[in-house]
From Swiss-Prot:
Chain residue ranges for the region called Disordered: 447-500, 518-538, 804-894
TM region positions: none
PANTHER family in alphabetical order: FRIGIDA-LIKE PROTEIN 3-RELATED, FRIGIDA-LIKE PROTEIN 5
This protein's UniProt keywords: Coiled coil, Developmental protein, Differentiation, Flowering
Keyword DNA-binding appears in the UniProt entry: no
Listed GO biological process terms: cell differentiation; flower development
Name of this protein: FRIGIDA-like protein 5
Tissue: Expressed at low levels during seed development.
Biased composition (Basic and acidic residues): 459-475, 518-527
Length: 948
């Protein structure tokens, strides 16, 4: 049992061990199964890898075989290349041999040709020298022939003068003796031959005696007139001549007007003799500024005729002429007296008063484009047409009777005739579009004026919405009609001067830019036909067909409104060469009388040229060498023309734009181009022009050259115009240098001249001009804080006093030894009071206000004062007192109502217009005074003279 029990225990133990062993075997079998699976996976991976490697090995073997094949081919090609190289070396050696042979042959040929060329050059040089000698001899012969002809003409003229002088000597011996200065008033002669009698009848003798007119060229007219005035001047002031006063002064005015019309050069000797008389007359005119207009006007004419404007300041000169802006020769007076700077103010004043004819005279004389509405003179004529039409309605009424219509037509004809006269006298036809000039001629000839003005009026209305100047005119037109035009002066014909013989008016010709001519005749002439132009539709068809030519474009640009330039743009786009078309349209070179000489001529107006250039600039055309060459040649002649006369600033701007568009700016010096245009135009009219021309970098050098050459004041104007103040600091030092250098030079000339009064006066004048220019520059650029303007004004007064003493012969003492002593004293002198400076301030009356009149008076005063005073307003007879008197003296009251004045009878031909001047006048700013203005209306006066 124990054995069995032990045996069972062993069996149990064996079971447990077996179970454990079985469990361990089961666990091992599971891991073995996993290993078997992994092995199979590894075996399959290795099999695939081996297959891939075998394939790659096969590919490598195939590649190796192909490389071996290619290596064999390469060896074969290397052998072929070696063979080719050997053949090339052989051919190269052969080529070098042939090249050497060719060089030898070429050198031999070149030597041969060189010898032939040298022989030809020697022959050509010899021929040129012979030709040059022959040309010089021909020129010398031509010059001798010309000199001989001139001498023959001079001899013939001298002989004619001698014959004419001998023939007229006996006839005019009494007149010459009366006019001679050395005879004067001491000559014993009959009563009717006295100096007073001569002055009373001087206008008839000078104007109506044709024999005297033939004799004047053989004398010195300036000396004759001076002697005649000087001989009667003292007698005029000593005696109370009563009604003969006006006749004496009128005779002086007649002589001075004729002298100014002759445009003679006054000799220094005559000018020196006229200076004392000018000083004396100027003093009398200042003292009688308000009470004696004829004397004031005569003084202004005398100073202008003899070039004595430097005797006083510009302010005093302005007070002399400001009352006579409606005088026919007022622009010429401004030019002769050196008042060009004040012209813009005068024009603005006339425009405000709607004195369009007087405005037209100034604009044509000085070419003032920028003062026209919108910068276009054509707009001014359109406003003139409108004003003339309204004035005609005021004169003739709004009725439809035949008499009223005839009166309106006569008024329009007279205004148009006067406008054409002013344009022709100033040679300003190119300023205005041809269409408006033709319409003006139509109105003058009375060819259905209303129908003729319809196209112009429509064009004007289209431009009203875009032009500022027209906006102002619209504002003015809102004033009630009766209030604005109640004082129109009916002047239908120009007064005939006593010296002019009444003759039949011959047809005249107005030159228009298109090359055509419009005939003008007297007021009674009625033309049969009116020149017409192709219609706008026909012109457009020609443009669209691509057959635009220069004459067609020229006609189109003259007819085209300046704001509607679509047709012009299309015309330039249709042509294959816009630049060439522009040259043919706008300009040309005309041969002159001299051999090989040319003269530049504009075929269109400056405004039309500017319009075409703007369109051409937008197109940016490609300009070929032939066209550019033509442009260079035209530019050279154009610049010469502008350099001779720079009156048309718009033409200068067109020239500069022309250079930039055609790319020929480099053909001219930058300093020359910058100096063509006034400094004010660079920034105001065309601010981007300098950049367009590429002249920005040249501006500092240009200004520096102006300073080096002594034009310092002008340099300062350019400094401010181009904004170069930061590069030329301080500006005040430049002004001080200018004054210092001018003063030193003048003092040196004064000392060296010793007792030569003419040279001393010239030195003083030079210093006075420098001081006035400096004062103007300081005021313009607001530099008053850096200078004492009062000291500069005192220096000018002291210099003028020294000048008077020198002219009178009393400046040879201490003044001549120390010319600057007067200036040093003036710097410490007490400043003048307001009353003392009144003659050069704003209390001098302005010209009569004729606000609605469209025609200007040809004479600034009346010969018959007594008759004119019958209708004067109350207060006219007040004593003058001091010039700076109360302003009420200039505005006397009256008791006439508007309706009463409108009922006064009007003679459309012989009426004058007078008014009272403006006491609030400012020398620096022209403008109308605030408050009411009073006028004399339609006084019956002698048409030859007008009473103020």
């Amino acid at each position: 049992m124990e054995k069995v029990t032990s045996g069972l225990e062993l069996v149990d133990i064996s079971k447990r061990n077996f179970r454990k062993t079985l469990e361990s075997l089961q666990e091992g079998a599971h891991s073995l199964l996993l290993l078997t699976i992994q092995w199979k996976e590894i075996e399959s991976y290795f099999d695939s890898t081996r297959s891939v490697l075998e394939e790659r090995a096969k590919e490598l073997e195939a590649l190796e075989e192909s490389i071996k094949v290619k290596a064999l081919e390469l060896e074969k090609k290397e052998k072929e290349l070696c063979l080719i190289d050997e053949s090339m070396k052989a051919k190269q050696s052969e080529f070098e041999k042939k090249e050497k042979d060719f060089d030898l042959e070429q050198k031999a040929e070149v030597e041969k040709r060189k010898r032939e060329v040298e022989q030809l050059e020697k022959f050509t040089t010899r021929m040129e020298s012979v030709e040059r000698v022959s040309d010089e001899k021909l020129m010398e012969l031509g010059l001798r022939a010309t000199e001989l002809e001139l001498k023959m003409e001079e001899v013939e003229k001298h002989r004619e003068r001698i014959v004419a002088g001998d023939k007229l000597r006996g006839e005019f011996e009494p007149l010459v003796s009366l006019l001679a200065k050395n005879m004067g008033l001491s000559v014993t002669m009959p009563v009717k031959c006295s100096t007073l009698y001569l002055n009373e009848n001087a206008d008839e003798m000078v104007k109506k005696n044709t024999a005297l007119a033939r004799m004047v060229p053989y004398l010195d007219p300036a000396k004759v007139v001076l002697d005649a005035i000087e001989g009667s001047f003292k007698e005029y002031w000593k005696k109370d001549l009563g009604e003969a006063d006006d006749r004496v002064v009128n005779s002086w005015i007649v002589l001075l007007e004729n002298l100014i019309k002759m445009n003679l050069k006054i000799t220094p000797q005559v000018k020196q003799e006229a200076t004392p008389l000018g000083i004396a007359w100027l003093g009398k005119a200042k003292a009688n500024m308000k009470n004696d207009p004829p004397q004031v006007f005569g003084c202004a004419l005398f100073l202008a005729a003899y070039g004595l404007g430097s005797l006083t300041t510009h302010g005093v000169l302005l007070t002399l002429v400001e009352r006579f802006l409606l005088y026919d020769h007022a622009p010429k007076l401004f030019r002769l007296l050196g008042l060009e700077e004040k012209v813009s103010g005068a024009v603005e004043t006339l425009k405000k008063k709607e004195e369009y004819l007087a405005t037209l005279k100034f604009i044509c004389e000085f070419r003032l484009y920028k003062l026209c509405p919108g910068g276009r003179p054509g707009e001014l004529l359109i406003e003139f047409f409108d004003s003339s039409d309204k004035a005609a309605r005021v004169i003739a009424g709004t009725g439809t009777s035949m008499e009223a219509q005839k009166a309106r037509r006569e008024k329009k004809k007279a205004d148009a005739a006067m406008a054409i006269k002013y344009i022709k006298e100033a040679k300003a036809e190119t300023m205005f579009p041809a269409k408006i000039l033709k319409r003006l001629a139509v109105v003058k000839n009375d060819e259905s004026a209303q129908r003729a003005m319809e196209p112009v009026q429509k064009s004007y209305e289209k431009r009203q919405s875009t032009t500022k100047g027209v906006e102002k005119s619209e504002a003015k037109s809102s004033i009630p009609y009766e209030q604005k035009h109640v004082i129109k002066r009916p002047r239908l014909t120009e007064p005939t001067a006593p010296s002019q013989n009444l003759t039949v008016k011959q047809p005249e010709v107005v030159c228009v830019p298109t090359g055509k001519q419009v005939k003008e005749s007297g007021a009674d002439h009625q033309p049969d036909t009116i020149a017409t132009h192709p219609s706008g539709t026909e012109t457009k068809l020609n443009i669209l067909s691509g057959s635009i030519k220069a004459d067609m474009l020229r006609e189109l640009v003259e007819k085209q409104p300046l704001k509607e330039s679509e047709d012009l743009s299309n015309a330039l786009k249709c042509t294959p060469d816009p630049a060439k078309l522009f040259l043919d349209t706008s300009m040309a070179l005309c041969p002159t009388n001299t051999e090989g000489g040319y003269e530049f001529k504009m075929l269109i107006t400056s405004a039309s040229c500017s319009l075409l250039l703007n369109q051409l600039k937008k197109l940016l055309p490609k300009i070929g060498h032939p066209v550019k060459g033509d442009a260079k040649k035209l530019a050279v002649y154009w610049k010469d023309k502008i350099a001779k006369s720079k009156r048309d600033q718009l033409e200068v701007i067109c020239f500069l734009q022309f250079l930039g568009i055609f790319g020929i700016v480099s053909e001219f010096k930058a300093d020359d181009l910058l100096g063509l245009l006034d400094n004010s135009y660079w920034q105001t009219v065309s601010p981007d022009l300098c950049q367009f021309l590429g002249l920005d970098d040249a501006i500092p050098g240009f200004i520096q050259n102006l300073i080096k050459t002594g034009h310092r004041i002008k340099a300062i104007d350019y400094i401010y115009s181009f904004g170069m103040v930061h590069r030329f600091q301080p500006v005040s030092a430049i002004i001080n240098d200018s004054l210092r250098i001018t003063k030193e030079s003048a003092e040196k000339s004064y000392r060296e001249a010793k007792n030569e009064s003419t040279t001393q006066v010239a030195a003083i004048d030079r210093q006075v001009r420098a001081l006035r220019a400096a004062i103007k520059c300081i005021s313009c650029h607001k530099l008053e804080s850096e200078f004492q303007l009062g000291d500069l004004e005192e220096q000018i007064k002291s210099l003028l006093k020294l000048r008077r003493n020198t002219s009178n012969g009393s400046g040879s003492g201490s003044a001549s030894s120390k010319p600057d002593s007067t200036i040093k004293q003036s710097q410490t002198a007490k400043p003048p009071t307001v009353a003392e400076v009144a003659p050069v301030t704003s209390n001098i009356p302005l010209e009569p206000s004729t606000e609605a009149a469209s025609s200007s008076a040809s004479k600034p005063f009346s010969k018959k004062n007594k008759r004119g005073k019958k209708r004067s307003m109350s207060g006219n007879n007040q004593s003058s007192g001091h010039i700076a008197s109360h302003t009420s003296n200039h505005y006397p009251s009256h008791d006439y109502s508007l309706n009463q004045r409108l009922t006064w009878p009007v003679d459309n031909y012989d009426r004058g217009f007078t008014g009272f001047p403006n006491p609030d006048y400012n020398n620096n700013q022209w403008g109308q005074p605030e408050g009411p203005q009073f006028y004399h209306l339609y006084q019956p006066l002698d048409p030859r003279y007008r009473n103020y």
